Amino acid sequence: MSSCSRVALVTGANKGIGFAITRDLCRKFSGDVVLTARDEARGRAAVKQLQAEGLSPRFHQLDIDNPQSIRALRDFLRKEYGGLNVLVNNAGIAFRMDDPTPFDVQAEVTLKTNFFATRNVCTELLPIMKPHGRVVNVSSLQGLKALENCSEDLQERFRCDTLTEGDLVDLMKKFVEDTKNEVHEREGWPDSAYGVSKLGVTVLTRILARQLDEKRKADRILLNACCPGWVKTDMARDQGSRTVEEGAETPVYLALLPPDATEPHGQLVRDKVVQTW
């Protein structure tokens, strides 16, 4: 395959919003679309389902919790396409409200995937993003709610325009540590591991966009976070008010921003509208 070929990639794409995003990109993106999933059998079944609809996604295994798996994907993209045009970081987890798992365990597991693993994907794949590339981190307004429920000191730190990636990583580690020591409330944290993980993703988005401006401004890569809304998925126990197709609209809009677009960039977007942070 020619390294001139354009390619879009979606993580956690075998079901739910990720599957709907992949389907829409197959219809609208001019180039190959790679559907990734942790479970190979489920991923290939999802590809077959889209093929039955007349679409032609490719499959590549990806477990975002496994750095080796991320690097294997990076090497595949480099070899097959010479890089990446569109990255949609959709893979993520959430514990159900009534899950009996201790809160500190929920915090560690949720942040491991939703924040740290998503950051690892960005660390490996952002350097191979091609000029005019588009990066979309699927976040949530739960992150904004978590921010509002943080202490004033934490809110100030998360909103600070000079917060570094290292600072953010330290804050996310501190949350996990504080839950283990049962002092997270005293330390100013909210009671939602999912919310804190998505707060981390949104702030990471702001930081990475700033880094792109500093290092690769001429490449005009746009990187944003989005909230798909409360969608009927396994994660929401099918109780959401939106269909997966509706949930995919804003991520796909951000993934397909035209080449001459200069914004949004480093923003949290819902229903195609930038949210106040």
Swiss-Prot record:
Q: What does this protein do?
A: Catalyzes the NADPH-dependent reduction of carbonyl compounds to their corresponding alcohols. Has low NADPH-dependent oxidoreductase activity. Acts on several orthoquinones, as well as on non-quinone compounds, such as isatin or on the anticancer drug oracin. Best substrates for CBR3 is 1,2- naphthoquinone, hence could play a role in protection against cytotoxicity of exogenous quinones. Exerts activity toward ortho-quinones but not paraquinones. No endogenous substrate for CBR3 except isatin has been identified.
Q: Which InterPro entries match?
A: CBR1-like (IPR045313), NAD(P)-bd_dom_sf (IPR036291), Sc_DH/Rdtase_CS (IPR020904), SDR_fam (IPR002347)
The species is: Rattus norvegicus (Rat)
Show the PANTHER family listed in the entry: CARBONYL REDUCTASE 1-RELATED, CARBONYL REDUCTASE [NADPH] 3
What enzyme category does the UniProt record give? Answer: oxidoreductase
Principal subcellular localisation of the protein: cytoplasm
* Keyword vocabulary terms for this entry: Acetylation, Cytoplasm, NADP, Oxidoreductase, Phosphoprotein
**Localization annotation:** Cytoplasm
One GO cellular component term, please give it: cytosol
Active-site residues, Swiss-Prot/TrEMBL: 194 (proton acceptor)
Q: Could you tell me one molecular function GO term of this UniProt entry? A: 3-beta-hydroxysteroid 3-dehydrogenase (NADP+) activity
Asked if the record carries the keyword Phosphoprotein, the reply is yes
- Catalytic activity line of the entry: a secondary alcohol + NADP(+) = a ketone + NADPH + H(+); a quinone + NADPH + H(+) = a quinol + NADP(+)
Q: Which residues bind substrate?
A: 140
> Which residues, renumbered to this chain, carry the PTM N-acetylserine?
2
Q: What is its EC number?
A: 1.1.1.184, 1.6.5.10
Question: What's the superkingdom here?
Answer: Eukaryota
Per the record, the similarity remark reads: Belongs to the short-chain dehydrogenases/reductases (SDR) family.
Q: What is this protein called?
A: Carbonyl reductase [NADPH] 3
Q: Which residues carry this modification: Phosphoserine?
A: 30
The Gene Ontology biological process terms listed for this entry are: cognition; phylloquinone catabolic process
User: Which residues are noted in the entry as NADP(+)-binding?
Assistant: 10-34, 38-42, 63-64, 90, 194-198
